[in-house]
Amino acid sequence: MDEYSPKRHDIAQLKFLCETLYHDCLANLEESNHGWVNDPTSAINLQLNELIEHIATFALNYKIKYNEDNKLIEQIDEYLDDTFMLFSSYGINMQDLQKWRKSGNRLFRCFVNATKENPASLSC
């Protein structure tokens, strides 16, 4: 993202990063042969943390550039917090997993709405 990129492009980048995080998290959950035991120091969890930090930095730049778009930023922050909390503990419980999934669903609905509000024909 730079100061000249159109808003729809910045939204698409944020959406891509958040979708990547979501799919990486799902893959991590599916690969767990230990049930609900988690290792926050594993290579995959460290990679998830790096991706979370990257998205948080990107979201901060987005917030500075589009300070009026608070709902999307709040939803991204909530999703990143829920993701970090889920994968930084040694045990994963159903309540935390459901909270993470719900915040992800809310975030991706926000992306759909933001995309509708910023179609390619209006933001060039």
Curated annotation (Swiss-Prot):
It is found in: Cytoplasm. GO terms for biological process: single-species biofilm formation. Induction: Expression is autoregulated. Induced during biofilm formation. Transmembrane segments: none annotated. Disruption phenotype: Deletion of hha and tomB, in the presence of a conjugative plasmid (R1drd19), decreases biofilm formation, cell aggregation and increases motility via flagella and motility gene expression. One of its GO terms (molecular function) is DNA binding. Attenuates Hha toxicity and regulates biofilm formation. Binds to various coding and intergenic regions of genomic DNA. Belongs to the TomB family. Hha and TomB may form a type II toxin-antitoxin (TA) system. This is Hha toxicity modulator TomB. It comes from Escherichia coli (strain K12). The gene is tomB.
